[in-house]
Amino acid sequence: MSATNPQPRMKNHVFKTALLVALLAFGAFGASGAASAKSLDDSLDCHSNGHKFVAPLLAAGDIQSEPMHVEANSVNAFRTNHPLTAYGFGVYVVLGYQANDPIFQPGDGTPIGNWAYGVVVRGTKGAVEQAVRKAGSDATVKQAFPFLTAIVCSD
């Protein structure tokens, strides 16, 4: 490297530093996120209801108290505050509804039924459905978006 042009070494150093920071951040998130993520597998067996699924998550501070979105059918979507998993997949949002329950905001259409609950996870429909069925759950599995899949129980 030329003494008159220190730029190549500087760019290389900045790149290495950025790469190291990114790897450390990913490693810290990966290790702490996976190790400390709360599993919702047992609750997604479809033997519960919207209130019994969502209320403990609210009480523990695992999800935000106000829904980020309410569907016309009254299904409420709650953001997570802490890492959650379902059948080994990271939870993107928690879903829930229970008729006449103040936890849930009503939508502007016909409610989905008396209750519904579930999650949207990061994963393909095929992989998620295989894990759900292997665990013995009767939950409905539907693709929400590419690589986002809903796991839902309802009455």
Predicted segments, located by residue:
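Bacterial N-terminal signal peptides that target proteins for export
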Residues: 5-21
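C-terminal segment of classical bacterial N-terminal signal peptides
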Residues: 25-34
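Short helix/turn-capping signatures at newly exposed starts of structured segments
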Residues: 34-97, 110
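Short, ordered beta-strand-loop transition motifs
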Residues: 68-74, 108-114, 140-148
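Long, charged/polar, surface-exposed segments that mediate recognition or autoinhibition
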Residues: 79-135
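C-terminal partner/receptor-binding element of secreted or periplasmic proteins
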Residues: 129-155
